[in-house]
Amino acid sequence: LRLSLEEDVRRVVVASSNHAADFYEHLLRSREMDMLPATNDIRPLSDNYYGWAKESYEHLGFVFATGTLGRKLENVHIRIGAPRSLDAATLEGDREGFPYRRNLGAYVSPRDLTQLMVKSIETENIDNEWGVPWQVFYGISDNTRSFWGLENARRVIGYAPEDDSEVTWATDVYENLTTKGVIGRVGRVP
């Protein structure tokens, strides 16, 4: 960030991680929370060092965005979800199928991630509600099972994801969540 400031870079787009706020997943899994909105008023909380490092870098970005170091360095931090194919092996030994369902909610397609990055770079004004050019967006597709909000990215940069993991892997989802003894809100009870 310092070098970007010194070299007169206007904006940085940073690959953050969903782990910057992964503490909330425990609340989501236990249904104590419905969805984690992607707004600047939700404090990121992580319960591991990797997430803490990502969270700290987001906060450091805010310092640079405020202009207290000479000028405002615009910051967009993208908490990337799961940019990979679904893996049925995550169902092994997990009767609730949580890792599999989590990846359904966290999935981001290459097309949607590209759109999110490009719009984060090209959108003219990214000022937040305090007039600070600093934003945090979740990098996920428009997934049926998403548990992170996209409202902020939709509103600020016009993000319009085109993919949904539920549609992309419809056959696999049906097979894996209804025929492998997975219990819970999806699938059948053995």
Residue ranges and their predicted role:
Residues 1-47:
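Conserved Rossmann-fold NAD(P)-dependent oxidoreductase catalytic core, especially the SDR/UDP-sugar
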Residues 16, 58-86:
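Conserved beta-loop-beta element that borders a ligand/cofactor-binding pocket
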Residues 49, 53-56:
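Active-site helix of classical SDR
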Residues 55, 105-112, 148:
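Residue-level signal for the nucleotide or nucleotide-sugar donor/cofactor binding architecture
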Residues 69, 82-97, 107-133, 142:
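Alpha-helical substrate-binding/gating segment
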Residues 140-150:
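Active-site loop of classical SDR/Rossmann-like NAD(P)-dependent oxidoreductases
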Residues 165-190:
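Amphipathic terminal alpha-helices
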